[in-house]
Amino acid sequence: MTTFQDKVKALRAHHEELLSRKNEPIEWGNGIYEKYKNPILTAEHTPLEWRYDFDEKSNPYLMQRIMMNATLNSGAIKWNGKYLLVVRVEGADRKSFFAVAESPNGVDNFRFWDEPITMPEDVVPATNIYDMRLTAHEDGYIYGVFCAERHDDAQPGDLSAATATAAIARTKDLVNWERLPDLKTKSLQRNVVLHPEFVDGKYAFYTRPQDGFIDTGSGGGIGWALVDDITHAEIKEEKIINARHYHTIQEVKNGEGPHPIKTDKGWLHLAHGVRGCASGLRYVLYMYMTSLEDPTKVIAEPGGYLLVPEGPEYIGDVMNVVFANGWIADEDGKVFIYYASSDTRMHVATSTIDRLVDYCMNTPKDDYRTQFSVEKIKALVAKNKQTLSK
């Protein structure tokens, strides 16, 4: 007969096998990056102590008392030689919270810290918080900018009506957080990201103005705004620096992912684009670059997507979605792109600064018409014929 302790032992062995599983790159990629065979984090990776009561008297059937649904949309930072993710963990009750998971190499063996982050509340408590972007700012703090969701009390009869604001917190150890007032804006805001450097002596934010909680409405794309005081941040003026366009991957909406990476050629940006299709909304990742001298000036934008859901990545709570709000650039130029698939699990893809800059600078842009797309393909065919005939 299997005893309670036998079940616990087997459960821990199964969990450890999952946590210690080695990850390997998938062969035959696109040359831009390498995806990896296994997700790096799933709901099953969360600590057993978060889910099980290990007291046989109060839990004789060894049931999960608190179930986890997903691990997704994680901020990322290199910290004390470790690769850290501030993960959005979603419970079975639909409430999201933040928790730190760390890895020695950035691609596998991610393990959560003992407890979730205790995030101080705003003056007006939020129902849900999620999708943190981490920025190690030159002012010495690590900032977390995330979405704070509350019910829209202006529509008391609609239980799905919600508001979205950009919440701001800062820390120096990723354990103790100081909550600052939410970013004051003229419209709802999601996907807000703090630029890592001062610009003209001010804090700079990438924004995404929108009319509704889901729909962007008149919001034109990824915006840019300067703020005098981060402790009472208010956006009075913003301008669109990366716009939406008809019949593109960012037709319906787009948003900045993590903060951009500084290179000697310009700022590398990772963003998500959304278009409508017969099955709903399709989320993909794309890139663009901005000038070092003027971070609002786009200097390169390759046409189409960089990364899309493939194979099992397509299946999950919200189908046909990839989303990224964290990446890490190592000192040797290697880049770790952390992305979630279908609002369910976390993955990693690796590349280099040089490859991503080459991709941005030398991939044809979208000229918004089929004719121009065909002309580019024919020009490449002609070039290859000439090259291969030598």
What name fits each language-model region?
Residues 328-333:
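Well-ordered alpha/beta subsegment
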Residues 336:
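Short, surface-exposed ligand- or partner-binding patches at beta-edge/loop junctions that are enriched
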Residues 1-73, 77-127, 136-193, 197-252, ...:
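Beta-rich carbohydrate-recognition and catalytic domains
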